[in-house]
Design a protein with these regions (language model features):
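Extended C-terminal subregions enriched in glycine
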Residues: 129, 140, 145, 149-152, ...
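Short loop/turn motifs at secondary-structure junctions and domain boundaries
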Residues: 6-7, 77-78, 184-189, 236-237
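Active-site rim segments in enzyme catalytic domains, especially the processed small/beta chain
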Residues: 68-70, 197-256, 263-267, 280
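Alpha-helical support elements that line or immediately flank enzyme active sites
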Residues: 44-51, 56, 259-282
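Noncatalytic scaffold domains of N-terminal-nucleophile
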Residues: 1-45, 49-51, 55-98, 102, ...
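Internal maturation/activation junctions in enzymes
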Residues: 16, 116-209, 223, 322
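C-terminal catalytic or substrate-handling cores of phosphate/nucleotide-
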Residues: 270-274, 296-365
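Short, small/polar residue-rich loop motifs at catalytic or cofactor-binding pockets
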Residues: 81, 188-191, 213, 239-241
Length: 365
């Protein structure tokens, strides 16, 4: 977030050492004021956050933190339940978040392109990197049909299948040949994901954002609570949110759950792990650690991680792709239970991404 983060005195109290150096990842953060707020909520209940003493502290302190939040707005807040968007995978069903979140839907489209008719598994090894780039390009183009609030279905499998008519195994497809052509979108990468599940298979995949790194960079005095930035002024980070779960409704089993972060590259990262774990039967740790590539439609560039294999690079270059290496492509947290939960919880594997400082922990109860 840079040095500008420490223009706020409350932020300096939390995230700087006594000598003025910033706390780094992996070091302990002490938030006594936030702990006090959480204790109040445990004693008085969640309602105190919206209409009680915590609400008054937030509303009163927001202006001091250069924010705008009234107690009337807190009282009027209501969570909104929305049905998930789903699609079939064999006998199972994927569920992901509906618009305005677009990351899970785009990852689902990338995955469907590869799974349909065993397209990825049947492709020669030397063609697979090219195939991944091409289906990613088409998935990002297809979302132009619905991402701006148009009435088109967000995950139309027939429409996706039709987009493969222009695919050539030996040559990159120009984005101008896709309908609609993809657009370049600046997406805020400030988000994170987490997954939690119990031995009964009850599972939540969650993706959240403060619309900017550390939100506004301002802490409400006396609370330890960071104010979120406005999506209208700093870019809609909700676009890239990418939670997904895979279940079998007939047998009431959970098989896979994941979430990714990383802005525009989040869907490609998630789809990469889904493909490796669910199509290639790769152990989850290997699936999450494996090198990734990303094509966001526009600009017409394939982004790869530094450890891409030479033969994959040559395959892309030979087919006319412009290739650029970047330090990392997204971060994924995932749980994979090949035997299903609650039926075979001992088959579950859980993994956080080596590209970040996440945590994966659990066991059989």
């Amino acid at each position: 977030a840079g040095i500008s983060l420490f223009t706020d005195s409350e932020m300096r109290k939390i995230f700087l050492h006594p000598d003025g150096s910033p706390i780094s990842e992996g070091q302990r953060v002490h938030q006594l004021e936030l702990g006090s707020v959480l204790s109040q909520l445990r004693i008085k209940g969640a309602g105190d956050f919206y209409s009680g003493s915590v609400a008054k502290s937030l509303a009163g302190g927001a202006s001091q933190a250069e924010g705008a939040l009234t107690i009337e707005e807190l009282r009027a807040f209501r969570p909104q339940w929305r049905e998930s968007t789903s699609f079939s995978f064999g006998h199972h069903t994927f569920h992901t978040a509906p618009p305005p979140a677009a990351g899970g839907l785009t990852a689902a489209a990338i995955f469907h392109h590869q799974a349909e008719g065993d397209r990825y598994l049947d492709a020669p090894v030397g063609e697979r990197a090219h195939l991944v780039a091409e289906v990613s390009k088409r998935a990002f183009a297809d979302r132009q049909n619905w991402i701006d609030g148009n009435n088109a279905a967000a995950l139309d499998l027939n429409r996706l299948q039709g987009s493969m008519a222009t695919y050539r195994s030996d040559q990159s497809t120009s984005p101008d040949m896709l309908s609609p052509p993809p657009k370049r979108r600046l997406e805020n990468p400030a988000s994170t994901s987490f997954i939690t599940m119990d031995r009964l298979g009850l599972t939540v995949s969650c993706a959240v954002t403060m619309n900017n790194l550390f939100g506004t960079g301002r802490v409400v005095p006396g609370t330890g609570i960071l104010l979120a930035a406005s999506p209208a002024t700093l870019g809609n980070a909700a676009t890239s949110l990418s939670p997904i779960v895979l279940v079998n409704h007939n047998t009431s089993q959970l098989f896979f759950a994941a979430g990714s972060a990383g802005g525009a590259a989040a869907p490609a990262a998630l789809a990469s792990v889904m493909r490796a774990a669910l199509l290639e039967d790769m152990p989850l740790r290997e699936a999450v650690q494996a090198s990734r590539l990303h094509h966001g439609g526009m600009p017409d560039i394939v982004l790869t991680e530094p450890d891409i294999e030479a033969q994959e690079y040559e395959s892309l270059d030979r087919r006319g792709h412009l290739v650029a290496k970047v330090p990392e492509i997204g971060r994924v947290n995932a749980v994979h239970c090949p035997g299903g939960v609650p039926r075979n919880p001992e088959t579950c594997l859980f993994e956080s991404d080596r590209r970040g400082y996440g945590l994966a922990s659990g066991g059989i109860l």
